[in-house]
Design a protein with these regions (language model features):
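Conserved beta-strand elements of the Class I
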Residues: 103-107, 196
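Short, conserved phosphate/pyrophosphate- and ester-handling motifs at nucleotide-, phospho-/glycolipid
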Residues: 28, 112, 200
């Protein structure tokens, strides 16, 4: 464990240095993390949890973000310290964003923004990408420094919503993220877009149903379902 950053309200970013030259995964995939001892010769993997990988491939470290929601993540909050050695295994999952000429709409609720960063940090010259990112409080905005850098890119379009935000002159809208908000922002591009959903299960279900009701085909809606 090389770095632990707290965002408050039980939300943490962890950076783990890996003992190999680089990690191999595709943007959108996840890893398993265990707090318990593991013997690679036994073939038995202990209790673990899965987390989206929030760092770029081919780095000597991996980054994850988690929020304290149950007993296991509470253990993580209590037991993880810089310098501690833990076991992870990767990569897993098929929530892989496909490059297309049509608009890509990445919808994130809370820590659900994590799997998008390896994709967003890849160099590109064309193809519009819209990140619709909703959080409850302003201090829950993750990767704010990276967002500021991306805002200078012509292909990147940020739509940031803070549920309990104010109407101050800040770079976000106050309110809850919704499909109607996305449709209003995209206009005629809404029907052309591919949608990626990542966040709390209730949010994902609501967005999927709302997109379907507006005529978006299932093949154009991609869901991060490991949660």
């Amino acid at each position: 464990m090389s770095k632990i950053q707290s965002f408050g309200s039980g939300v943490y970013e962890l950076e783990l240095t890996v003992p190999v030259r680089s990690t191999k995964f595709q943007p959108g995939q996840f890893l398993h993390l265990t707090l318990d001892d593991f013997d690679p010769t036994s073939g038995w993997w202990p209790e673990s949890r899965v987390f989206s990988i929030a760092s770029e491939p081919k780095q000597t470290f991996v980054t994850i973000v988690y929020s304290v929601k149950g007993n296991y993540t509470k253990r993580m909050e209590d037991e993880l310290v810089v310098g501690k050695k833990i076991w992870i295994k990767l990569p897993y999952g098929d929530f892989v964003i496909q490059e297309k000429d049509t608009p890509l709409v990445l919808v994130a609720g809370g820590t659900g923004v994590s799997p998008y960063w390896p994709f967003l940090l890849k160099p590109r010259e064309t193809g519009a990408v819209h990140l619709f990112y909703g959080v409850r409080e302003e201090n829950h905005i993750l990767f704010f420094d990276k967002i500021q850098i991306l805002k200078s890119q012509k292909w990147f379009h940020l739509h940031l919503m803070v549920e309990n935000g104010s109407v101050k002159d800040l770079p976000y809208k106050a309110g809850r993220l919704s499909v109607s908000e996305i449709k209003n922002e995209l206009g005629e591009k809404f029907d052309l877009a591919d949608f990626y959903l990542s966040g709390p299960p209730v949010m994902i279900k609501t967005f999927k149903n709302d997109l379907t009701s507006l005529g978006i085909m299932d093949s154009k809606v991609h869901i991060d379902e490991w949660e």
